[in-house]
Amino acid sequence: MKIIVDMMGGDNAPLAVLEGTAQAVKEYGVQILGVGNEELVRRTAADNNIPLDGIELVNCTQVIEMCDEPARAIRTKKDSSIVVGLNLLKEGKGDAFVSAGSTGALHVGASLIVRTLRGVKRPALATMVPAKKQAYLLLDCGANVECRPEMLAAFAVMGSCYVNKVEGRQSPSVALANNGAEESKGTPVLKEAHQLLKTTPGIRFVGNIEPRDVPNGEVDVVVCDGFTGNVILKLTEGVAKMLLGMLKQMFLANFGGKIAYLLLKGGVSDLKHQMDSEEYGGAPFLGAKQPVIKAHGSSKAKGIKNAIRQAKTCVENDLCGTMQSALDELAAANKPEE
């Protein structure tokens, strides 16, 4: 299996990307097609004693920056690591693409270069979010700010497939993020989406879920538009950071706190591990014809390695093929009777 990796994407590129890809080659047995400034990548590898075994490099001269307008960048920076990498994926030179680069550029590129599955207007950005009982899949978490009901139904189908194939959960539960549990709550779009989800084949829809209940992790998939999802995601990250900071302050405040920390050290370490987003890899663009994984922009080696593991799992389980079959079933169910 060959995974295409953007060597120039993210705050810590190319060093962290190199370290993560080298670890992935060793641990997962994958081949890497690294796209980026070859001279810089080779020099960084040599300076840090990082082996390039199993890593083939493809040179490119441009990088899409976070400040670039996504659609314009995809059109004009043809020799950027993202555009070159996505084209290599489209051409069958690799099985999946991983990048910690611009989310907007990846969304546009996944739509225009890799293209989308039948029944998908635009790919949804999905991510596993830590929660009390178990992590849940949140989609869309930022790619599509406004969504029609049929888009939310497609998200539900794809999210259910992902949690089943990649996370290994049987008959995953799907909920619609809303401001109330009752069917009558929400905007007209959410009310219509609720009715549509009740009759969507292939998913186990459990109704609306209020934001206060989302962190409990009682459902496997939470469906929403990209604006709502991004708010949920960033609020979760902020609250987690705040709580860990408050715990640290409490433990360091006095001698008693330090003693308490020694007694609770194992539990605190487990909590930090559970809340570490790098453990979950990256955020897939569900709905692209081939796996495109967005690693966090601040990813270190572990995050890159786990994003590659995630891409490998998607390919091994034919996630895109499974989603296409489920989407075709959805389209057939919603086809008007003649």
Roles of regions detected by a PLM:
Residues 5-14, 143-153, 294-301:
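Short, glycine-rich nucleotide/cofactor-binding loops
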Residues 111-124, 130-138, 218-222, 226-336:
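Glycine-rich phosphate/nucleotide-binding loop
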